[in-house]
Amino acid sequence: AKEFKKGITANVLYTQIGAEEHLDHALRFFMSAKSAYVSGQAVYIKDNGDEISLVDFDETKPLKGKKILVTGASRGIGESVAKVLARDGAELYCLDVPASLADLQKVAGNLGGHALPLDITQTDAGEQILKACGVLDGVVHNAGVTRDKTLANMSAYKWDLVLNINLKAISTINNYLLTNNGLSESARIVCVSSISGIAGNLGQTNYAMSKAGVIGLVEATAKSLDGSARRINAVAPGFIETKMTGAIPFAIREAGRRMNAMSQGGEPVDVAATISWLVSP
């Protein structure tokens, strides 16, 4: 993938014997402009016995009738995810911290969704989500923070803050929703990881650990969902042009842009398009 010119992508689909009828969904995504920033990826397609019906499927509104929660939805990637999911027909519940309520209400209001101000690190966050949203068809765990320092200069507070928001909250909320009938039988969960969780990054030990943990959590949870129609996946974006990454020193930003397969930074909508595909039926 790294040998191609800009604008050319290469991915591979591993398909389990007997799962060929599930290929259409993936091929439509990878052959469309929606996958423009997805390259060098391996996707595994399995048949878990769930039935496929395209009779009433509307490709222009693939998420019509689906109730989906997006965390960290007041800005950046979360806001873009909310916009794309709304475009694709989803009923949205937009969640962010109470301090971002004004921005959150603006995003949710513009999309005809619901604003849910909530600190996801609260021990009863899962309970509050279920009470506010009811049974969900999808959850996008996008909320996350950085508190960058080299390991030698990392305070316990910054370490714990990043791990609690980026990883522990996801695990706690998923566990509550899965054990308290908070997810529909064919629900989709998508967790936002990062390339830092795969390759690490200088001065981001806490962030890299949290995002690596997200990948491990998804892989472990996927095994527990085996045999059901529920799905869980993670996306690990490379360098994405957001306000958060805009605060990174220029040299590091430029290195981040050049390290990915596309040799350029992505936009939040690129991540959003991939997430919309993963939460679609």
Model region roles, listed by residue range:
Residues 150-151, 158-159, 256:
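Substrate-binding pocket helix/loop in short-chain dehydrogenase/reductase
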Residues 194:
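Residue(s) in the substrate-gating loop at a strand-loop-helix junction
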Residues 8, 12-53, 58, 234, ...:
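C-terminal helical subdomain
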Residues 90-104:
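Conserved glycine-rich Rossmann-like NAD(P)H-binding loop of the short-chain dehydrogenase/reductase
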